[in-house]
């Protein structure tokens, strides 16, 4: 009852303070939630947030900012609320305690009513609206400085709140009590209404946010992998000498060799067990019946099978994608294009490749990204070292399209400037692509902004530019394909062969239907016309955008770092503004020739129509100068990698730390 009386003495100032405290508490809770969500490693959340920021930047460029209004009004309201008349009526009382985090919905709703009643009503309005209250006797306890009531009617609009006012003496307290109790007759309390005793409100405590660990990949795909990763090692036997491919523009010979290799078949009692050190991951029905290779469309009734299969096989993971996944045969089908299974890949033109997981021996991990890992493996039947790219399917239809595009590009393009493709297979929710192993890795491994390594020298830079341009030119002229994601991490090099090749065609597109999707590729290397476009879906993505990305990549390899100012790295909008509004970066004149500077300047023209074509770039004097020269690329890559590994051993680190811009995106 004392709490009910105390609620009547609440002033508007106290209500505002309570609201401010609640707002601060809410903001703290919100920040806690944001911090928790920021630790998620889910690629879709990170990508969605980045796209939202880019979209906000585009809208800011189209709209004029108006002067902020309302600040004067807020100052006037603040001044009026703190006028001398109001200050005299304020009773210095502590804020009411906040509700318990685990309290019921009723208590939360009643607490919100107290805040609303305290903040929006003056003392007079509160007294006039409380017609159900019946205060018959008031006792002032000076020792405890609490105002108590012996008899008080229950007010259903205001919950019980423990408020301890500051009372200096008996006279002042009695005077205040009289002011709060005008001489008027209160209505009788209804006899039929019974109200339960409300519990005491405990101090507010922020709800604990429980970070539920995401289910592991092996658990989601039904695999029981060892802690160290996928084990593909065989028992000790006669050592075989691994072979490396000689530089060759075609992989036809090796594909035929792989097609003739035998597949070890047989039922296994435990699909997730390790047999002879080889991870057994055979899919359901793959060894009990013939593989569905008639066409590339799923059989009739796959939709029903997927809905009724539950969690068996791949049904639980791909229940909504029956048009791609054939549950009965355990295959991944792209209508009219290709079909993937645990035994290999079949293309619609009749060509096929037979590589299985049992034939691969894991050697090392080359890299990892948001959708999977890249591993160095040995194909035991042919004794060929390969690189397997694992792409996990996360119920994202866009990922299916990326897999289809990359497999099509790799299959169609036999070029000395594009990585060779050996085959692919599909097992338990992941696609494994077997490609040529490039022992030098991506080009970002052979340059650094530190003085110990530095950027790539001009002769080798011209060799790299020539190889990349020829690869992009073949994609465009022979296959009508644009890459859309040209950057140093998607360009591979081989120290053994001294070659440079393009890879990663997941976001590539056909020029016939080249309407670009929003923010395809890495935003750090995106052309300015794509960033500032308000409707990128309607803007046709041309090869000119790839030429901008090529120029920016060459400049980064020359400098050893991302070419835009480091002060823009931490702010996405600053980096976008530098790309769109700022002048394009240039090669330093003291280290590079005028021909090299002119080549980069042509690629980084802000107006797309002013950028040269691939044919014009191949005949540029800078590339012609070094075309017939031996730049000793193999020795150069080897020396750079050895220098890098030596630095890492001395520092005891796994990789060189780099100042990465905010727009950089990881992935495979």
UniProtKB/Swiss-Prot annotation:
Record's subcellular location: Cytoplasm
SMART domains, per database record: S_TKc
Keywords, comma-separated and alphabetical: Antibiotic resistance, ATP-binding, Cytoplasm, Kinase, Nucleotide-binding, Phosphoprotein, Serine/threonine-protein kinase, Transferase, Tyrosine-protein kinase
Gene: PBS2
GO terms, biological process: actin filament organization; cellular hyperosmotic response; hyperosmotic response; MAPK cascade; osmosensory signaling pathway; osmosensory signaling pathway via Sho1 osmosensor; p38MAPK cascade; protein import into nucleus
Domain Protein kinase: 360-623
InterPro entries: Kinase-like_dom_sf (IPR011009), Prot_kinase_dom (IPR000719), Ser/Thr_kinase_AS (IPR008271)
UniProt name for this protein: MAP kinase kinase PBS2
Residues where ATP binds: 366-374, 389
GO molecular function: ATP binding; MAP kinase kinase activity; MAP-kinase scaffold activity; protein kinase activity; protein serine kinase activity; protein serine/threonine kinase activity; protein tyrosine kinase activity; protein-N-terminal amino-acid acetyltransferase activity
Coiled-coil segments: none
Residues recorded with modification Phosphothreonine: 518
Residues annotated as catalytic: 485 (proton acceptor)
Entry keyword Transferase: yes
